């Protein structure tokens, strides 16, 4: 008879404050919740919530992703957060509003979108 392999139970940390990173591109929105040291507590994305194709880039999809990530983090005791927003996508504001509606105390909002000092050549203009 095979021996039973002992698995470690997931340790529930009690984290009071953390950092929420919202990466909003034109195609998707990714929300990552970390502790102050940068260790990931939970994450979610519009694509991971079941939105496919162009529906991933909607503000509603960003709101759902944000609610999902925050719900997982609040189960571990998260209460106050700092928010870092990156990217030009349509889900920026709605993801942020979903955080505040979930009951988290937002202490700081910072835009960390990388802006080139004339770096790489951008993609060609779309002709629709």
UniProtKB/Swiss-Prot annotation:
<comment type="similarity">
    <text>Belongs to the universal ribosomal protein uS11 family.</text>
</comment>
<keyword id="KW-0687">Ribonucleoprotein</keyword>
<dbReference type="InterPro" id="IPR001971">
    <property type="entry name" value="Ribosomal_uS11"/>
</dbReference>
<dbReference type="GO" id="GO:0019843">
    <property type="term" value="F:rRNA binding"/>
</dbReference>
<dbReference type="InterPro" id="IPR019981">
    <property type="entry name" value="Ribosomal_uS11_bac-type"/>
</dbReference>
<keyword id="KW-0694">RNA-binding</keyword>
<keyword id="KW-0699">rRNA-binding</keyword>
<protein>
    <recommendedName>
        <fullName>Small ribosomal subunit protein uS11</fullName>
    </recommendedName>
</protein>
<comment type="function">
    <text>Located on the platform of the 30S subunit, it bridges several disparate RNA helices of the 16S rRNA. Forms part of the Shine-Dalgarno cleft in the 70S ribosome.</text>
</comment>
<dbReference type="GO" id="GO:0006412">
    <property type="term" value="P:translation"/>
</dbReference>
<dbReference type="InterPro" id="IPR036967">
    <property type="entry name" value="Ribosomal_uS11_sf"/>
</dbReference>
<dbReference type="InterPro" id="IPR018102">
    <property type="entry name" value="Ribosomal_uS11_CS"/>
</dbReference>
<dbReference type="GO" id="GO:1990904">
    <property type="term" value="C:ribonucleoprotein complex"/>
</dbReference>
<dbReference type="GO" id="GO:0003735">
    <property type="term" value="F:structural constituent of ribosome"/>
</dbReference>
<keyword id="KW-0689">Ribosomal protein</keyword>
<comment type="subunit">
    <text>Part of the 30S ribosomal subunit. Interacts with proteins S7 and S18. Binds to IF-3.</text>
</comment>
<dbReference type="Pfam" id="PF00411">
    <property type="entry name" value="Ribosomal_S11"/>
</dbReference>
<dbReference type="GO" id="GO:0005840">
    <property type="term" value="C:ribosome"/>
</dbReference>
